[in-house]
């Protein structure tokens, strides 16, 4: 297993574009950005002022933004510039010089590798403040009065609040790997637990993993799963994402393999998911069993 880049005494993993794991354009090595001092490969000292929408801490250098993951507002650090695009640079931590008292140890053991979360290194009140500031900043840029934005409401306790899960399927040494894309790359990080997901969604992920041998005849077509849970009732609806339309006998196989493995399951769907996109929500789906909604 690769080292967790959240360890703040070692360089962090390269910044990415968010949980989708999309690739980012890179400026040729040594090329200067549209601002003095920002050159790919160079190390500079920055002080972070705010969090960006993709979970990176953002500093301003000569009027240009430098975004670095796993840092926090108020911190000062030496960073290495990894890439430059359209005058905006991304970098990685090299040495933390001034730490923020609002940085905490993430609860999730996958944080720093998994691309599903980017904020767990900040204490929860700081997360809410930064998310409120993001909305206000967006309104300001649109010339809409930011005082219309109320402070963000939190979830107490701030765990198990996500009621929708999108997971991807990969392979490693011939075995299936179920989890989320790594931040900034196409590699799949296997996830056994997720403290921000509702337990019903985690149970669905565990059930798919346990049923994989039974699902092997269709495994080549399966690329992910979409799970939704009703927070009040605990009802779960599961969509199995496939790159092609499953045959009738394959659909029966999926129903038999999963029906008794997932607690509170009320609906099972086949989601059409061609390889050209990682997004699963909003795609065409066919009902295999039960009903197409939770209540």
PLM features: what roles do these ranges have?
Residues 2-295:
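Accessory RNA-recognition modules of RNA-modification enzymes
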């Amino acid at each position: 297993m690769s080292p967790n880049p959240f360890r703040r005494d070692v360089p962090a993993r390269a910044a990415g574009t968010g949980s989708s794991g999309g690739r980012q354009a890179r400026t040729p090595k040594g090329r200067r950005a549209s601002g003095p001092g920002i050159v790919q490969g160079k190390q500079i000292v920055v002080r972070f002022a705010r969090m960006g929408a993709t979970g990176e801490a953002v500093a301003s250098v000569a009027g240009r933004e430098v975004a670095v993951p796993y840092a926090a507002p108020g911190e000062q650090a030496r960073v290495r510039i990894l890439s430059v695009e359209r005058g905006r640079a991304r970098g990685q931590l090299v040495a933390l010089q001034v730490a923020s008292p609002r940085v905490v140890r993430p609860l999730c053991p996958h944080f720093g590798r998994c691309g599903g979360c980017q904020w767990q290194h900040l204490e929860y009140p700081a997360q809410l403040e930064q998310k409120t500031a993001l909305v206000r900043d967006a309104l300001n840029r649109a010339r809409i009065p930011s005082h219309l934005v109320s402070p963000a409401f939190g979830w107490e306790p701030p765990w198990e609040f996500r009621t929708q899960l999108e997971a991807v399927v990969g392979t490693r040494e011939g075995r299936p790997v179920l989890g989320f894309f790594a931040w900034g790359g196409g590699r799949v990080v296997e996830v056994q637990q997720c403290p921000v997901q509702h337990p019903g969604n985690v149970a669905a992920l565990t059930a798919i993993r346990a049923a994989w041998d039974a699902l092997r005849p269709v495994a080549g077509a399966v690329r992910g799963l979409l799970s939704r849970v009703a927070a009040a009732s605990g009802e779960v609806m599961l969509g199995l994402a496939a790159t092609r339309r499953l045959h009738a006998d394959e659909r029966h196989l999926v129903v038999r393999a999963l029906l008794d493995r997932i607690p509170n399951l009320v609906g099972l769907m086949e989601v059409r998911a061609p390889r050209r996109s990682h997004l699963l929500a909003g795609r065409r789906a066919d009902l295999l069993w039960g009903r197409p909604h939770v209540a």
